Amino acid sequence: MLRLILSALCFAQSVFSVEIIAHRGASFDAPENTLAAMNLAWEQNADAIELDLWLSRDGRLVVFHDADAKRIAGVPRKIADLTWAEVQQLDAGSWKNAQFKGERIPTLEFILMTIPKGRRAVLEIKCGPEIVPELKRVLAASKRSPRELAIISFNFESLKASRETFPEIEHYFLHSYKKDPATGKFPELKPLIARAQAARFHGLNLHFDWPVDDRFVREVKSAGLKMLVWTVNDAAVAKRLASAGVDAITTDRPGWLREQLR
């Protein structure tokens, strides 16, 4: 009986050690990548927020996921082709719910000012390395500690350039689990680990479709890398990943997921 109790306590402890990252804020309940979503994430006790970054035509760091504004604001123009003044005119909330009508697209500078003490922001670079100089300026002006930040990207060159510019900030290589159209094969872990090590990234941030189990996580961590997963909105999947030893889980529902992991 004592052994069973100790085993249960160890499992609970491993679950609670998992960092919960709010995907584009609390995006299940509020419009993604808006101040409303970020504030709600903190209310739901998220450990961190994840947000996406593009450069506007005039060089501002815009918090937005898609390359264009059609899905969110009904405007089929690329963020990179819009000035910041034009971006400010877009309604980023009505598509989600009428109560969010008029919600605006924020800048990174603004979001960084709202992060509570002890929490952090995970910044996803959506474009090329040209974003790095402005990112350097904004992060320096924010006075945020490197411990309050992490940077992620699917774009290897962008992430590499960022890693070289911000050696004190954790960097994670994003990767999906889809078949290569040319070979028909799924990606393999070992080459991915090798790339991350060569670029001196701090870890991998993988889609939960990867065959993640205890052995998988051990292989990543034995290579000196941390292991993050996205985007998990299923309690059973989250519990499996937590028990396997992942460091963080990204979810659209941070408050709900924390309750499920109790």
Language-model region placement:
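Sec-dependent signal peptide recognition
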Residues: M1-A8
